[in-house]
Amino acid sequence: LLMDKINSLEINKTGLCYMNFNVRTYRAERQKVWDQFSSKNWVTPTSNLTMENFYFDMASHKFVISPRGNGVDCHRTWEALYLRTIPIVRASTHMNGFTDLPILFVNDWSELNYNRLQQFYETVQNKFFNLDKMKISYWKQRILNAKNTCLINR
């Protein structure tokens, strides 16, 4: 897997915040986010990269801006976690089960600034996070446990 290859490299987190997404997907939010952050000197905005360059760039940053896509979340959030980069997402009820993962939740994109990123990174950089929730085996076991509980409580 390409992400495994990139994860096997010792990539320094030289950039603070990475931004790479298609503004034509869920334009109502993404265009505003792009316009708001593309000129910030602490954000690296890019587009139209090969998958390998995209993953490498993401892995070399501490954070990645991950606005929702066609659905209520975005593949970038999960790719970022896998690449040990902290995704920044809008807080929503569908993400309540993931507050124990290294994700920076914002209620509004206007909350995002250089100081907030630095402070958040300081609080999480040396913490251990159990990323089992990213594995299908975790969810299969949760479903089996729930099924067994239902059968026992009949």
Question: Which positions does each model-derived feature cover?
Answer:
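Nucleotide-sugar donor-binding catalytic core of glycosyltransferases
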Residues: 1-78, 82-105, 116-154
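Active-site donor-binding loop signature of nucleotide-sugar glycosyltransferases
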Residues: 107-109
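GIY-YIG nuclease catalytic motif and its immediate N-terminal context
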Residues: 113
